[in-house]
A protein has these predicted regions:
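Catalytic alpha/beta active-site cores
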Residues: 1-223
Length: 223
């Protein structure tokens, strides 16, 4: 119990023979250098936890298969497992990412980008999944902000470019078309970012996005 046991496990990760660890988490590709470093750190953490933190009878029960001690590679640190992100507050009131103040977004596209950055930061500071409840409801106000910008631009185009009196009905129709394209681009941003971002724990974020809004919601059309 007092002997360091990590050498074989670590070298097994380096030469791709430690299949127990390499195949344990399908979200982690142990052949990628950044992920491999996380797995190596995990083996060191497990060794310390087994020798210094977890009671001997629990370790014995785990090794015998009587129980499974989940996430042993993270237990030595006071980290969160899973969480429900308060995205609505972070977008409405601004947040801090990597020590930098992020103001409330002024468009749907920027709101989508900031959302993915928040997801990446949360994923890098914990080791479990994360959920966002009602993302359509949360992002809807930023659709309206984008619509307002497009409507103002279209009215200005009618007056200054085409030299005509603004037709608000037509202007709103054109503005909504531009908003719909921005929505498609923003959702694509979220999809691509979530699936391609690499966090500090060597994997893409594990995220659940739940969509829900009430029919009488103020931003029902935008949602």
């Amino acid at each position: 119990r007092q002997t360091n046991t990590t050498d074989t496990d670590v070298f097994g990760l380096l030469d791709n023979t430690n299949f127990d660890v390499l195949d344990e988490n399908s979200n982690k590709n142990g052949h990628v250098v950044s992920t491999q470093r996380d797995l190596i750190a995990g083996e060191i953490s497990k060794d310390i936890a087994r020798r210094k933190l977890i009671p001997a009878d629990i370790v014995q029960a785990h090794d015998s298969g009587a129980i499974h001690f989940h996430d042993m590679d993270y237990i030595i640190q006071p980290m969160f497992n899973c969480c429900l992100i308060n995205l609505e507050d972070m977008l409405a009131n601004g947040t801090v990412i990597n020590g930098k103040k992020i103001d409330t977004p002024r468009s749907f596209q920027v709101a989508c980008t900031v959302t993915t950055q928040i997801i990446a930061q949360v994923a890098s500071g914990q080791y479990g999944g994360q959920s966002i409840n009602g993302i359509d409801r949360i992002l809807a106000p930023y659709v309206r902000k984008s619509f307002g910008k497009y409507l103002e631009a279209v009215v200005e185009e009618q007056r200054d470019v085409y030299g005509i009196e603004p037709d608000m009905e037509k202007a709103e129709e054109i503005a909504w078309k531009r908003v719909k394209k921005e929505i498609k681009d923003g959702i694509q941003t979220i999809q691509y970012q979530i699936n391609t971002l690499m966090t500090t724990n060597g994997q893409a974020p594990f995220v659940t996005l739940f969509m829900y809004f009430r029919p009488d919601y103020e931003y029902a059309r935008e949602a």
